[in-house]
Amino acid sequence: MTEPAILVLEDGTVFEGDAVGANGLSVGEVVFNTSLTGYQEVLTDPSYAYQLVTLTYPHIGNTGCTDQDDEANKVWAAGLIVRDVPRRPSNWRSQISLSDWLAARGVVAIAGIDTRKLTRILREKGAQHGALMAGEIDVDRAQDAARQFTGIKGMDLAKVVSTKQAYSWYEGQLDLDRNEWKRAAPQYKVVAYDYGVKLNILRMLAERGCDLTVVPAQTPVDEVLALCPDGVFLSNGPGDPEPCDYAVAAIKTFIMRRVPIFGICLGHQLLAQTVGAKVVKMRHGHHGANHPVQDLRSGRVMITSQNHGFAVDEATLPSNVRVTHRSLFDGTNQGIELLDVPAFSFQGHPEASPGPHDVDVLFDRFITMMAAQS
């Protein structure tokens, strides 16, 4: 027999369903993601910290879960909201069902609700503060928790999810035929700032010959320069970039030293912020694996994976910055490059996981940039 569960929004809307994870109470910003698959990668993506993730596809959990698909060493999403979870997964790689995986990792989750109705609310009203409660239900307590949540705006979550110690990374992507991780001969020394980095980003860099040192978000610039890097990578991550003054200070120095820079997601916003641009909170953000983005230089349209609730305000970019990519959903900025130094960034996720690989050429561009600089 399943336990009851509820989702309560800050506007007072209550959804009743069944618990499909751990019992308890969890609060966060309620967002929706349109990906059909990749639920495990989504939940373990540090960019989803303090977010209650609604998956719009009705059947979630069909392929179970496997340790190889984690994007971090824990679940970072605050909770999961779905329409239906199958009783039995079917996939040759599956090690455990989604429900058991959620329970084992202490994730509060709800199934059996009208996710279409919820998504319409989020589209019309914007991302909502919410509370998930499973097991012993107290609607008033859940509603109070939802309304007391202060929101992600103004929260510096990069230093919360970041690694506490520097480490090296050499592992490439998974070779499914051999069931082993690929390796490549290291050619370029790259320091990756961990603002909430996904493992597949590190794998794609390592596979292209990057000798990676991953450092905490607040690592002083002098410690990084002492490693004599050929390039610096600015990772994805959760929260608002505005409070991350420590990151802006470091990036300014790398720009002055002309160290090649590549940023993704939060790293993109931090690069833009460093050169003087403003970053604004979006109404409901971009979360999904089917977002069309146009390369303004070639005119090519690429389908991309997206996960962000803030966007760079193009009108505030200085004259020495060129806009390279733009969303075809809402026209928001998706990429920039500095004209006078070797630095560029992309708002979406070229590493996918989950999603298409249309934009993985950006990793190759970073390699080419370091080769030219050296």
From Swiss-Prot:
Keywords: Amino-acid biosynthesis, Arginine biosynthesis, ATP-binding, Glutamine amidotransferase, Ligase, Nucleotide-binding, Pyrimidine biosynthesis. PROSITE patterns: GATASE_TYPE_1. InterPro entries: Anth_synth/Amidotransfase, CarbamoylP_synth_ssu, CarbamoylP_synth_ssu_N, CarbP_synth_ssu_N_sf, Class_I_gatase-like, CPSase_GATase1, GATASE. The keyword Ligase applies. Residues 1-186 are annotated as: CPSase. One of its GO terms (molecular function) is carbamoyl-phosphate synthase (glutamine-hydrolyzing) activity. Residues 189-374 form the Glutamine amidotransferase type-1 domain. SMART domains: CPSase_sm_chain. Its EC number is 6.3.5.5. L-glutamine binds at residues 47, 237, 239, 266, 269, 307, 309-310. One of its GO terms (biological process) is 'de novo' UMP biosynthetic process. The active site is at 265 (nucleophile), 349, 351. Pathway: Amino-acid biosynthesis; L-arginine biosynthesis; carbamoyl phosphate from bicarbonate: step 1/1; Pyrimidine metabolism; UMP biosynthesis via de novo pathway; (S)-dihydroorotate from bicarbonate: step 1/3. It catalyses: hydrogencarbonate + L-glutamine + 2 ATP + H2O = carbamoyl phosphate + L-glutamate + 2 ADP + phosphate + 2 H(+). It is an enzyme of class 6 (ligase). It comes from the Bacteria. Composed of two chains; the small (or glutamine) chain promotes the hydrolysis of glutamine to ammonia, which is used by the large (or ammonia) chain to synthesize carbamoyl phosphate. Tetramer of heterodimers (alpha,beta)4. Small subunit of the glutamine-dependent carbamoyl phosphate synthetase (CPSase). CPSase catalyzes the formation of carbamoyl phosphate from the ammonia moiety of glutamine, carbonate, and phosphate donated by ATP, constituting the first step of 2 biosynthetic pathways, one leading to arginine and/or urea and the other to pyrimidine nucleotides. The small subunit (glutamine amidotransferase) binds and cleaves glutamine to supply the large subunit with the substrate ammonia. Belongs to the CarA family. This is Carbamoyl phosphate synthase small chain. The gene is carA.
